[in-house]
Every structure is written in C-alpha cells, then in structure tokens.
Amino acid sequence: MSISPMMQQYLSIKENHKDCILFFRVGDFYEMFFEDAEVASRELELVLTGKDCGLEKRAPMCGVPHHAYAIYASKLVSKGYKVAVAEQLEDPSLAKGIVKRDVIKVLTPGTYTDSSFLEDTKNNYIMSLFIHDKVSAMCFADISTGEFNLTETELDFEIILNEISKFSPKELVLQENLDDKLVDKIRERFDVVYNRFSNEYFKEHRNENLKAQFSNYAEVNMTEGLKSCANGLIKYIIDTQKTALTHIDELQKYEIVDFLSIDINSRRNLELTETLKDKSKKGSLLWVLDKTSTAMGGRQIRKWIERPLIDDEKINLRLDAVEEMLTNVSYNEDLKELLKQVYDIERLAGKISSKSVNAKEMISLRGSIEKLPAIKKLIKNFNSELLVNMENALDDLGDIYKLLYESINDNPSLSIKEGNIIKEGYNKDIDELRLAKSHGKQWIASLENTEREVTGIKSLKVSYNKVFGYYIEITKSNLNLVPEGRYIRKQTLTNSERYITPELKEMEEKILGAEEKLVLLEYNVFCEIRERIEKEIDRIKGSAKILSELDCICSFADVARENNYCKPVIKRDGTLVIKEGRHPVVEKVIASGNFVANDTVINNSDNVMMLITGPNMAGKSTYMRQVGLIVLMAQIGCFVPASAAEISICDKIFTRIGASDDLNAGKSTFMVEMWEVSHILKNATKNSLILLDEVGRGTSTYDGLSIAWSVIEYICKSENLKCKTLFATHYHELTKLEGEIEGLKNYSIAVKKVNDDIIFLRKIISKGADESYGIEVAKIAGLPEEVLVRAREILKDLEEAKPKTAENTEDKKTNIVKEEPKKDSYQIDFNYLERESILKELKDTEIMDMNPIECMNKLYEFIKRAKKL
C-alpha cells in the first residue's frame, strides 16, 4: 500500500520539525498524527482515534478545533513542548490537488507571544549562551516586548547561574559542545527547555544579521563571542517566528558589576520575588512593593528588585522622585487613575511587529495613547530631575492616535478577516462596497415582505447559511399556500421546505461578491495601517518604558506612605546605620503595631561584625534578613522601613540563612553550608554585606565551633575583606571574642524569663546572650511535660559537673584555657564541649516526631553519654 498524498505532505513537513508537535491544518481542525497524536492525547486529554493514510494500520490521530488551537498549544508549551503550526496556504475550494501547507510559526516556551497565556507582570525571556576563549557571552530577549539584553564575563559557572536566576528564562539556546557539567547544573537548578546548536550556527552571517536587525549595532562595543551569542539567539527567534521582528531593534548591553550582586542562595533566602515555602508572590518583597497600575510597571518593578543599583547618582534620582511623589498626594492619585486605563502597550507593540495584532487591540492602543497628554501634563507639575526628564522624553504619540481614531471602528470584529474593522469615511472604496452590500440586504428584506403578501404566508422567511446561500423557507403546514411554479425546491427538512428563485440567486451573487470584496479590502487596509504604525514602534516602546518607570515611582510612593517608610541617606563611607528598622514583609503579616523595631549600627572599620546570640525562635534570622532587605530597598531607590537610615552602597549581598540541603545531588546539609560559606569568603569584598546564620551547626560541636571561630577571624582580620557582617550563632563561647578581635561586638535578642517560661522581646541589645533557653523553647513547641522535667534534670546535672574554664582563668575574654608553656596557643576543654553537644542535641530533638519507646531510648542515650564524662 502507498501512503496517501496528504500524509506524504504531513511527513515531509514533520521531517523538518522533528522536535515539535505538529499541528496540521485540515479544514476546520488542526490534526496530529502518529507519536505526536499519542503525546497530545495524553497531555491534553484528547480522544485518540485513527485515520486511513495508505498504510496497513490506521495512523493514530487526534485533533482540536482551529479557532481554539491556541488554548491547546499553550498547554503543551507550558509543559515544555514545542508546537509547529502548519497552516493551509490557499483556499481549499480553489486548490488543484492537495492543499498547499507549511509551518507558519513554531511556538516554544521562550518565544510564545500570546498575551492571553503570558503572565502580565513577568517577562518571558529566552537566553543564549556562547563560551569562547574562557569568556562567557549571554543574551536575554523577550520577544513579547522587544527587549534584548547582552553581557559577557569571565567563564565562571556561578556567575552564569546567577544571571539565569535574575532573568528566569523559559528557554535556552546553547552550543553543542558546551561543558556538560554546566548544562547539568542548569538542569538541576532551573525548570527550563534548552536547544543545542553548532558553533557555526552562532557564527554564520553574524555581522550581516546583526546589522540588519539592530539599529544601534555599530554603536555597541561587541567582542566576537558576544556577536556570536546575539546572532545565535536572533536566528533562533526568526526561525521560530518565521518573520522579521522589527520591534527587537536595540541592543541593550550591560555590565554585571554595574548592579548589586545577589547570588542564587541569597536571592532565595531574602525571598525577593517569591517565597521559599510555596514559591508564591505573596509574602515576598515584591508583594509588598508592587502597587503598580500597569502590566508594564509590574514587569519593571520586578527588574528593579532583581537588579539593584550601585550608582549613588541614579539611586538618588529615584529617591528624589519618590519623595516628591510622596508629598504630592493628589497628583500621585491622579496619575494612578490615568495609568490604570493604560493597556500593555509594550506587548501591543510586539504584536504589531509580529503582525498578530487584531483590531480590538488597536482600539486598546488608541485608548492608552489617548491618556498620554494628560499624563504628560500632570508630570509637568514636578521638579525632581527624574520626573522632569520623564516629562521631556514622553512622546504623546498624537499622530498615531489620530490615525487610529480615524481608521478603526470603535467596536470592531475580533478577527481581521471578518470585516467590520475600518471606520466609515476612512476609505472610499470600502464605503461604496458597504453601500452595495446594504442595498442588497434591503432588497432581501423587501423580497421577504413581498412574498408574504403574495402567498399570504405570514411565517415565510428569507434566510442565509454558508452552505446554501440565500433561500426562502416555508413551514410544512403552509405548503398548500405556495403558488405552483413560483419557487424552485432546494431542500426538504422535517418541518419545512426551502426554495430559491433565479432573482434571489442573482442578488445573492451581488451581495456575496460585495461582502467578499469588502472583507478582503478591509483586511488589506488594516494591514496598511498596521505597517504605518510599525514604522513608529520605537516611539511607542519609548513611551511605554517611561510609563513603566513612572508607575514604579508611584508605587514606591504609595508603599512609603502606607507603611511609614523613610528616605534613606545614600553614602560611600562604609557605614550602615538604621534607626528603628523593620522587616518590610513580616510587619505586614503580623498584627498591626506588634512588630518590634530594631537599630543597626555597623561599618567596615571599627564595627565590622555584629555577633548575635539568643534562643531559637527569638528572631535572629528575621532581623538579619531585615537588614539585608533594607539595604537592597535603598539601592533600588525605594524608601525603607525605618525612622532613619544611612546606607553605604554595597556591591554584593551574601546570606547563609536556613538549611538548603541538596540531597538529590548527594550533598549533606553541612557540605552545602560549607560550600556556601566558602563561596561567600572567596567572593565578598570590603563593600559587601554578609549575613551568616548558625555557621557550623551541621557537624560536631568541636568542628562547628572551630569553623565558626575561624570564619569570624577571617572576616574581621583580613585586610582584603573586613566587610559589614551579621553573624548569628548558638556557640556562646564566641561571645568572649569581643575585645580580642577588633571590630567584633556582641549583640543578642532580649528574652524575659518568668519562672519556667520565657517571653521573646524581639529586641536587639548590645550584649551576648546569658543562656540558650532551649528547654523553654521546647516547652513552647509542645513537648510532653515529663520530657521537659527530665531534660531539666539532665541539664542541671551537666551544669553542676561543668568544669571551670574561662570564668576562672586569666583569659576570661576568650573563654579558653591557656596551655603552658606555649604562649598564645589555646586548648578547648573537650569534656565541656561534649556536654554542650549533648545539650544542643537535646534542644534539637524533635520529640513530637517520636513514639514513647523512641523517647525513652533517646533519654537513655543522653544519660549513657553523660556518665562517660
């Protein structure tokens, strides 16, 4: 048996798109065959059938209606599949033989542009990576907005991973020979689709391609590696979209060092855009700061949070604008009301460029542009430099508004191929065809009245459908009234008969001819209008960018007013002074007024490190995150949750807070912790901020204390480091280092003890903690009373057996015993540390997860170990 001609056509197209699920247009459906059908049936829950194709067995098949294909395609794309859309390229009724078909677009996670299925306030990036001569070039594009960013840096896996984390691309374009270790790291950390191409793919015709695509190509300093990287990405985009995209016309080169660096772990620990627990926006810093009114503003504020500034001049421009907006409440409110009426013109510009915009979206663009003069007039009332610059640069796009107002119907059809999109009076030929169509329909209405009078059949109707055209319909109960020979029978139905007349068919040809010509002419005129606007895409994008930044300034002002934030003073002298600082997120989720504010005073000279002790649950981690977030907020140009703040610009923020086991990679808690600490110590500079929580807790007491002690010394004593650090620990022995290590000062979370209960005061005080209060915390957690009683007995026994160490030696400040005759050498009392280890394990024991037998066994183990001391 031979394969049918249509199936041969299908297989030929599929051969060129092996990595895609092929949507093959057949009449009113898109059909999928063979393995594609099986995958689509499973993923989309479609009925799997079969189709005769000339083979011995029927080809597995499933299909979706053509008008709803985008819904099904988006579901596949969201699951990481690529979808190739093969369209009919000619009218089937006019085709000679098999209808011509070909792929008109390939839908992929990183190139999907249908705004119905994209997150409004999140960019949809696709990334390319090209490594050459130990230099990594990276490009990030969002074809829905026209954004194209590029940078390069030394070959460092962590830097690459950090950039991927900032942009969160949905798809990657990589070299075939890229190091598999890097590819594995990317796959482990990110849910992303990737494609691999030869080096030749990246390099081929790069100068010609980039010159043709980007208007500023000649002005941007690009290495050969960066050119290859950009070329590979733009080629892939054009290959999938099957058309040139004129709105992607500006290369935006940036330097990584121009922004505050926050690595992946720190970004996660600080919960900048999503929470650690459930990856939701609610509970993140973005959730607090995002009061934007437009989708463009929502995307922009996310970018600002992901890429804080280190240029004090740019930071102060934003802060001054926020301050002025904050003090002019009425103008701010008026601006917000106008911005709420602005659609996502950034993505509308992208749809114009990709020729996928419809007439209703053109009306949305017109309505948005209509608000620009009023917005421009309002901004004119401000005097801060940034807002003045915005007013001067904002193009009100008056000529584009005029064109859209004169040309597009106020309530047009959704499809641009159904007519009713061009406004009356804009095009003479369209008006004449509409008149002809209108006269024809008037004739039809007149015919219906005439035939009713002639026949006496009041229910007689002249109707239309696409199969039979116009016809006269008479119910069977009235057939006896039909004059003989007046009509030609066309169709018999259960309850009626349908007839035609030569005159009716003649008028039908005139009406349908006018309608076909009208629809085609309206479509062509719409395309001309679209092309005229496409030439002004850069102006539209420029105004969209200004509106997005203005929206962010309004949002920052709202948040500052609502939460009583202060304007930080930006400095360069290394100081960090925060008066009555608060955690921006935590204070929003607890009862109003219950958050305890705390001061922070630190620098990178004589007050380098805050050594913070105190019981678990007292608030050490919250306090440290609070400081990190306040610094970051200041550097994005936002007011901060404090009564006053002096913030010296940081180049990097590092955090080591909370467990982050990578068990799938075979790494223990302690191994991950040590890797993170190592990364921090190797990459921090004098201008960095380090937040370390419980370093050393993942190993034995001896090792943990030694490592924590050594890390403290390294940070405080290293001339190349000595940066601002908050170091929380449960090792109380370390508090004796104050006075021994220059720049280290003790702090603790205040606790009030009432009988056997404790009250967390949440207040940072300048002294070390007196004790751990582990058993009291265990009581709060709900451990059985008999376990708590026994724990107190064991603790009392341990404390009574505690050897004399630092308190009864000359070296009281370091909590160590000097060993003779070696001067300046130290020896730790290992029996004491073993007791501390038992105590720590007792505090960390999750009694609620154990049965009574396990509890008794655990207590027996503690007693056995204690007796050996």
Curated annotation (Swiss-Prot):
This protein is involved in the repair of mismatches in DNA. It is possible that it carries out the mismatch recognition step. This protein has a weak ATPase activity. This is DNA mismatch repair protein MutS. GO terms for biological process: mismatch repair. Gene3D superfamilies: 1.10.1420.10, DNA repair protein MutS, domain I, MutS, connector domain, P-loop containing nucleotide triphosphate hydrolases. One of its GO terms (molecular function) is damaged DNA binding. One of its GO terms (cellular component) is cytosol. SUPFAM superfamilies: DNA repair protein MutS, domain I, DNA repair protein MutS, domain II, DNA repair protein MutS, domain III, P-loop containing nucleoside triphosphate hydrolases. Belongs to the DNA mismatch repair MutS family.
